[in-house]
Amino acid sequence: MSSPEKKRKTTKKPSPTPQSTTPNPSLPDDLVVSCLARVSRLYYPTLSLVSKSFRSLIASPDLYKTRSLLGRTESCLYVCLQEKDSDPNPRWFTLCLKPNRTLTNDITEKKKKKKKKKKMSSGYVLAAIPVLHSRPAYWSGLVAVGSNIYNIGGPIDKAHSSIVSVLDCQSHTWHEGPGMRVERRYPAANVVEGKIYVTGGCKDCSNSSNWMEVFDPRTQTWESVSSPGAEIGGCSIHKSAVVEGEILIANSHGLIYKPKEGRWERMKWDMDIGWVWYSYCVVENVLYYYYKGVFKWYDTMARLWRDLKGVKGLPRFARCGGKMADYGGKMAVFWDKIVTSDDGCKNKMILCAVIALERRNSEEIWGKVEWHDAVLTVPLSYEVVYALSPTV
């Protein structure tokens, strides 16, 4: 009798687990940080709106360490607006690109441009920084060193103060720095080789040893600086700037301090005029100022002021109504104009221009307007107090 045929056992293969259909699966934080570090910081305000995790990563120290290691640090424009000098809460903004700057939009705009001649938007705006506990800036000295902005001195309850507040432009948080040796109100603050020199604004101008002091951010210490003498120092300083490592101080006399030599000298008359009462800035060791639609620069060799050539397409603005700043070797200019809305309400429109600079020979510097546009609208009572460009 034949043995029965053995039946083969069949086993069903388990059905494969369905793969995730999420178009953007989550990535490890270190990979996201590596990607973000390669993106211009002009896009960070927009990227921070994507999610809470993005917002957290954009404010993380790891991101900025990576940017530094990759050589991706860049100059970033920061603007402080204040409601006259009595406003206890100034508002801070940074220049960024609008969220809708995409390739599709650019192509669409180019097609529209062929149909009608209309000025295209530059895509730049001033984005508000959600920074808390900002001290008034109107009567303080403000400078940028590295990725920090220092708010130095100024009145506290209408009195002189030695307080130093530091805005970390990576995390957008304030912290207190070491206080000055002397209480000051509306001091001049300048940076030479990473050190901050603070001048004037003292209560007691008769004590010349108080006139200038210097802060070293690396050692976090203040030291006194030799004085030119109380008789020519004085309490008030109209303007100050740094050119070729020397501090120019425009007061009733006009002084120059040379930190490397530790000595003072009188400013030449031809340099003492012009820039003192107007909007000005220093870009790559050249002092510029604006007056009646013309930008001028000081030729230190010939000891005279020359016109900046080639700047076209900018509207005129008040000689003292604008603010100028070094923006990574270019010149950034802010000014305002009054606009009326449909309901008759008057506001202030803040405009900005970025000008590329080119020295063609020892006697000629040319400027080219890369873009200019309205970047913010604020209530009429606000004004631009400072424009600075820390490196972040």
Swiss-Prot record:
Q: Where is this region: Disordered?
A: 1-27
**Pathway annotation:** Protein modification; protein ubiquitination
- Biased region (Low complexity) positions are 18-27
Q: Which UniProt keywords apply?
A: Kelch repeat, Repeat, Ubl conjugation pathway
Start and end residues of each F-box domain: 21-67
UniProt keyword Repeat present? yes
Q: Which domain of life is it from?
A: Eukaryota
The Gene Ontology biological process terms listed for this entry are:
protein ubiquitination
What are the ranges of the Kelch repeats?
148-194, 195-242, 244-285
Q: Where is the composition biased (Basic residues)?
A: 1-12
| Segments passing through the bilayer | none
Residue span of the signal peptide, if any?
A: none
Q: How does it assemble?
A: Part of a SCF (ASK-cullin-F-box) protein ligase complex. Interacts with ASK13 and ASK14.
Q: What does this protein do?
A: Component of SCF(ASK-cullin-F-box) E3 ubiquitin ligase complexes, which may mediate the ubiquitination and subsequent proteasomal degradation of target proteins.
The protein depicted here goes by the name: F-box/kelch-repeat protein At4g39550
Q: Which organism is it from?
A: Arabidopsis thaliana
